[in-house]
Swiss-Prot record:
Disulfide bond entries: none
Source taxon at top rank: Bacteria
Gene Ontology biological-process entries: translation
Keywords per UniProt: Ribonucleoprotein, Ribosomal protein
Protein name per UniProt: Small ribosomal subunit protein uS2
UniProt GO cellular component terms: cytosolic small ribosomal subunit
UniProt record similarity statement: Belongs to the universal ribosomal protein uS2 family.
Pfam families: Ribosomal_S2
GO MF entries: structural constituent of ribosome
PANTHER family referenced in this protein's UniProt entry, alphabetically: 30S RIBOSOMAL PROTEIN S2 PROKARYOTIC AND ORGANELLAR (PTHR12534), SMALL RIBOSOMAL SUBUNIT PROTEIN US2M (PTHR12534:SF0)
Length: 332
């Protein structure tokens, strides 16, 4: 794996260079503005390119050191891209309303996350039958409300090590909380925004859907590169197995979509290297016949989600697949 590459042409095609109307500008962004056309400020992509590369390097370095990245984008056009990118790169996200104190009052937020986990457990088990239809509906509504706000961070387990923000004006509370806790901020900063306090500033259009999709994709790939680097630094050699192939489980006993094994093929991979996988979760993987990264790397979304449900962490499934692919590619 390597840091994701991009070109100025890609930025142009995505509309990254289009700022806001010239009368809506923030004078503090003057250094990053190339000029104006039809009363629309044009962002200087000659500066955006190296600054975006710097932000990608920061994301990769943070993840390579075992850090967590929090994607923040609550505006409508950013919600899906932020969630997809975070899941694909085994990171975390907030794409609904930012709850004040999400970072600075983590203890209270953790309590809400515990409540969300409890509701998930109750509603997905037979315990739900003990409630009346009206009570179940009330619990479901509470669960859905919590999931919208906290679903993307319920597995984070602590404060992030870096946050990536789309639209610094809209996410100003998130940025203030990060600054108060000395958490680095990488952000897309448009011509109507204040660049002050942004650790890794990237001048660019924060409204166009194509531009936002490009940013999210690049940040996700940088995070995956960091995962790959972390595994490489740990000295894991996935291709070192020289022992005979073990007998596979009968096909009828295997969930569709992956190859279950009766035992590891040679030395089993340390599945605890995957984000959120404890010794207990690793044992559940093994009970399902999963011992190696290459098995996880072959999962499609549906199969990954089913396996995630089997081991009790369905929200992490896509992230595990991304990590497994990175590890497998590193070994090759």
């Amino acid at each position: 794996m390597a840091l994701p590459e991009f070109s100025m042409r890609q930025l142009l095609e995505a509309g990254v260079h289009f700022g806001h109307q010239s009368h809506r500008w923030n004078p503090k962004m003057a250094d990053y503005i190339f000029g104006a056309r039809n009363n629309i400020h044009i962002i200087d992509l000659a500066q955006t390119v190296p600054l975006l590369h710097r932000a990608l390097q920061a994301v990769s370095d943070t993840v390579a050191k075992g850090g967590r990245i929090l994607f923040v984008g609550t505006k409508r056009q950013a919600q899906d891209g932020v969630a997809d990118a975070a899941k694909r790169s085994a990171q975390y996200f907030v794409n609904s309303r930012w709850l004040g104190g999400t970072l600075t009052n983590w203890k209270t937020i953790s309590g809400s996350i515990k409540r969300l986990r409890h509701l998930d457990e109750v509603l997905s088990s037979g315990d739900a039958n003990a409630y009346t239809k009206k009570e179940r509906l009330t619990l479901q509504r509470e669960r859905d409300k919590l999931d919208r706000s906290l679903g993307g961070i319920k597995d984070m387990g602590g404060l992030p090590d870096l946050i990536f923000v789309i639209d610094t004006n809209k996410e100003d509370i998130a940025i203030q909380e990060a600054q108060r806790l000395n958490i680095p901020v990488a952000a897309i900063v448009d011509t109507n925004c204040d660049p002050k306090g942004i650790t890794y500033l990237v001048p660019g259009n924060d409204d166009a859907g194509r531009a936002i999709s490009l940013y999210c994709d690049l940040i996700a790939r940088a995070a995956i590169d960091g995962i790959s680097r972390a595994q490489g630094d740990s000295g894991i050699d996935i291709g070192a197995s020289v022992q005979p192939v073990q007998e596979e489980l009968p096909a009828a006993a295997q969930p569709a979509g992956f190859q279950g094994l009766a035992g590891p093929r040679g030395v089993a991979d340390d599945l605890k290297k995957l984000t959120g996988v404890s010794g207990e979760i690793e044992k559940k993987f093994n009970d399902l016949g999963i011992f190696h990264y290459w098995q996880l790397a072959e999962f499609d979304h549906e199969t990954a989600h089913k396996i995630g449900e089997e081991v009790g962490l369905p929200s992490r499934a896509d992230g595990w697949v991304a990590q497994a692919k990175a590890l497998t590619a590193e070994a090759e």
